[in-house]
């Protein structure tokens, strides 16, 4: 993939394009990867981790471990976290839209 000619080359924050999975706070790759392509052009946009059963199990276990701490938060604390996430989505809306539409 040549990022100079990719539709994703215009991202204001290239760090938003992740090709691994976030599991338990750690970016996890895989032994194999597969291409995500722009269906309009056939151009490869990125090579992403081809995760399997072990990674799925790790993600489920991490979510299970995180649940008690989330459950213990007050509605106000949860709301503040969700509002922070919403603000980040708004802040990066243009780049996120480019990433999402490039692979559609």
Identify the residue ranges that each predicted region occupies.
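Glycine-rich loop-to-alpha-helix module at the N-terminal edge of alpha/beta enzyme cores
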Residues: 45-104
């Amino acid at each position: 993939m040549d990022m100079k000619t990719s539709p994703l080359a215009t991202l204001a924050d290239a760090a938003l394009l992740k090709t691994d999975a976030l599991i338990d706070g750690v970016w996890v790759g895989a032994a194999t990867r597969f291409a995500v392509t722009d269906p309009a052009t056939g151009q490869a946009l990125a090579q992403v981790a081809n995760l399997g059963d072990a990674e799925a199990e790790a993600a489920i276990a991490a979510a299970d471990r995180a649940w008690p701490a989330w459950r213990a938060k007050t509605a106000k604390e949860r709301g503040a976290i969700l509002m922070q996430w919403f603000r980040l989505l708004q802040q990066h809306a243009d780049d996120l839209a480019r990433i999402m539409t490039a692979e559609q």
